[in-house]
């Protein structure tokens, strides 16, 4: 396997995992602190998808930290295959949650003008923006691990 920046067990891989955790946790926190998120199914789905992303990314960040401290490699084909599948699943779920929440945000709060609380609208929009940033970092990780698996 070739050395690609962002692969599991490297510092750039750890930075990607930590940024995924931070963006997903930020998205959850802004959505949960807004008042009526539970009345929109897309927002509830976004929280579920971002919650799964936090768990997945935090677990892999711990694994990356362990590999860096112990100077171990995480490039066995079985592990890389697991990373590819997990990253692609969480990437798909995160993109679906972010896109559906963005659609609801634009429809209800932009087109219909039914946002009477400005602070709540900003929280929804910020949560969706953080979800898309999370998805971008997941996409980078998943493409990196797929490229790594294909080069084996």
Curated annotation (Swiss-Prot):
Membrane side Cytoplasmic: residue ranges: 1-21, 99-127
Keyword Transport: no
TM regions (residue ranges): 22-42, 43-63, 78-98, 128-148
Localization of this protein: Cell membrane
Positions in the Extracellular compartment: 64-77, 149-152
Tissue: Expressed in the stele of the root and in leaves.
Family that this chain belongs to: Belongs to the Casparian strip membrane proteins (CASP) family.
Name of the protein in question: CASP-like protein 5B3
């Amino acid at each position: 396997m070739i050395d690609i920046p962002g692969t599991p067990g490297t510092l750039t891989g750890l930075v990607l995992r930590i940024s995924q955790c931070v963006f997903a946790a930020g998205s959850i926190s802004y959505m949960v602190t807004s008042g009526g998120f539970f009345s929109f199914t897309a927002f509830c789905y976004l929280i579920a998808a971002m919650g799964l992303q936090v768990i997945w990314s935090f677990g892999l960040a711990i694994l990356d930290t362990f590999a860096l401290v112990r100077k171990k490699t995480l490039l066995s084909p079985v592990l890389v295959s697991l990373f590819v599948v997990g990253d692609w699943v969480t990437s798909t779920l995160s993109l679906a949650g972010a896109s559906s929440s963005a659609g609801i945000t634009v429809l209800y709060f932009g087109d219909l003008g039914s946002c009477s609380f400005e602070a709540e609208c900003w929280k929804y929009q910020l949560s969706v923006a953080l979800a898309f940033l999370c998805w971008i970092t997941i996409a980078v990780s998943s493409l990196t691990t797929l490229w790594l698996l294909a080069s084996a």
